[in-house]
Amino acid sequence: IPDPTTAGDFCRRFTVPDIEALMNVFNETRLRVWQQQPASFFELAIVEADGTVVPTTGECKEGMDINHKGQWGYHALVLSLANTGEPLYVVNRSGNRPSHEDAARWIDKAIALCRRAGFRRIVLRGDTDFSQTKHLDGWDTDGVTFIYGMDQKPNLVDIANALPEGAWDRVKRPAKYAVKTSPRRRPENVKEQIVVRRKFKNTRLCSEMVAEFDYQPT
């Protein structure tokens, strides 16, 4: 194990092209490993995009910045194969950069990698930060499915409110866990008692409803 200062000096020698070349080497090896999987493995690839905050307490870290929560550090873009949890691409960015910045280029790289591997279907997944409307048509034309969140914009709220009551279905979520022994008595909820005693407004989820409608962003 090298001395920390030696390891840091070695890592700082890597430029962006060096790191991209290293990720490409990993992925070339990954392709060969995947070929050992059964045919069912290649039925579907779920490519997940996420912006991950990497905080630091250092003061001399090159490229760090402060984010909207007041944290110093970096905001890495992580593209992973959700089926296995493998990180396909990790892109370091300054801490104040938005999640979607340069994401489409790396998503396209992940799609190309999965195509080379032989996946028959590809699904992109992520939160609202990755639903970049200028790229959706291209992915759809390319036969790629995507599941992205959409911001609660007024026009979408109006469409949802105008749907007939019969268009909505209750969301059924599986239990978080199964009790393998006898159920135990729940302890007293101290927080709930304080909320009631002080007459705070207590908003609780009663149910979730879902509906589908066609929508094409402009």
Language-model features, listed with the residues they occupy:
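Short, conserved catalytic/metal-binding motifs centered on acidic residues
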Residues: 1-3, 7, 43-53, 85, ...
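Short, positively charged, Gly/Tyr-enriched micro-motifs
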Residues: 1-29, 81-88, 107, 115, ...
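Short acidic, glycine/serine/threonine-rich loops at helix termini
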Residues: 56-62, 88-92, 102, 133-139, ...
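Electropositive, glycine- and tryptophan-enriched low-complexity nucleic-acid-binding patches
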Residues: 67-117
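An anionic, glycine-rich sequence signature occurring as long contiguous blocks
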Residues: 145-218
